[in-house]
Curated annotation (Swiss-Prot):
This is Elongation factor P. Pathway: Protein biosynthesis; polypeptide chain elongation. It is found in: Cytoplasm. One of its GO terms (cellular component) is cytoplasm. InterPro entries: Elong-fact-P_C, NA-bd_OB-fold, Rib_uL2_dom2, Transl_elong_fac_P/YeiP, Transl_elong_KOW-like, Transl_elong_P/YeiP_cen, Transl_elong_P/YeiP_CS, Transl_elongation_fac_P. Keywords: Cytoplasm, Elongation factor, Protein biosynthesis. GO terms for biological process: peptide biosynthetic process. The keyword rRNA-binding does not apply. Involved in peptide bond synthesis. Stimulates efficient translation and peptide-bond synthesis on native or reconstituted 70S ribosomes in vitro. Probably functions indirectly by altering the affinity of the ribosome for aminoacyl-tRNA, thus increasing their reactivity as acceptors for peptidyl transferase. It comes from the Bacteria. The lineage of its organism: Bacteria, Bacillati, Actinomycetota, Actinomycetes, Propionibacteriales. It comes from Nocardioides sp. (strain ATCC BAA-499 / JS614). Coiled coil: none annotated. Belongs to the elongation factor P family.
Length: 187
């Protein structure tokens, strides 16, 4: 058991027998009335997102979540195969659970796999990853002054928007939460 004051992003709550991951939370102390916590929760099984408000200090039941570092091996067409880096056990994960993480997964890349009672809940990637641009229209000299963007395909096949001066073959840093371009990788 925890209270709403202990909430953190990524924490998993057991509400009415269903598991919900905390996506966002905000403690609100209005000028008049008691403080409360506004949250955005994502159902671990259905991926449905809801907004829920709790009174500050309300007790909530937390789910026991085991987070293990695993290495992504390959996609066999029907599932994504990960390997535990300590025990070398392999685990097949359904595409629905992998979700948007598939857009940033490269073979041999490490990720955190969260499980509850042996069931995979979700995959956590680092906040940003470095990926190579495999296709984009060529940039023109002097295109760095404007804030305009163009589509670019990453080595994973995912398409993002990049500034006009980025060229094919360059490595870029990408935010895994919203697919936004963060910068060019030096070296």
């Amino acid at each position: 058991m925890a209270t709403t004051n202990d909430l953190k992003n990524g924490m998993v709550l057991n509400i009415d027998g269903q598991l919900w991951a905390v996506v966002e939370f905000q403690h609100v102390k209005p000028g008049k009335g008691p403080a409360f916590v506004r949250t955005k929760l994502k159902n671990v099984e259905s991926n449905k997102t809801v907004d829920k408000t709790f009174n500050a200090g309300t007790k909530v039941e937390t789910a026991t979540v085991d987070r293990r570092t695993m290495q992504y091996l390959y996609n066999d067409g029907s599932s994504y195969v990960f390997m535990d880096v300590q025990s070398y056990d392999q685990l097949e994960i359904a595409p629905e659970i992998v979700g948007n993480a598939k857009n940033f997964l490269l073979e041999n890349q490490e990720a955190i796999v969260a499980t509850n009672e042996g069931r995979v809940l979700f995959i956590e990637l680092p906040a940003s990853v470095e990926l190579e641009i495999t296709f984009t229209e060529p940039g023109l000299a002097g295109d760095s002054a404007t804030g305009r963007t163009k589509p670019a395909t990453l080595e994973t096949g995912h398409e993002i928007q990049v500034p006009l001066f980025i060229n094919q073959g360059e490595k870029v840093k990408v935010d895994t939460r919203d697919s936004s371009y963060l910068g060019r990788v030096k070296g």
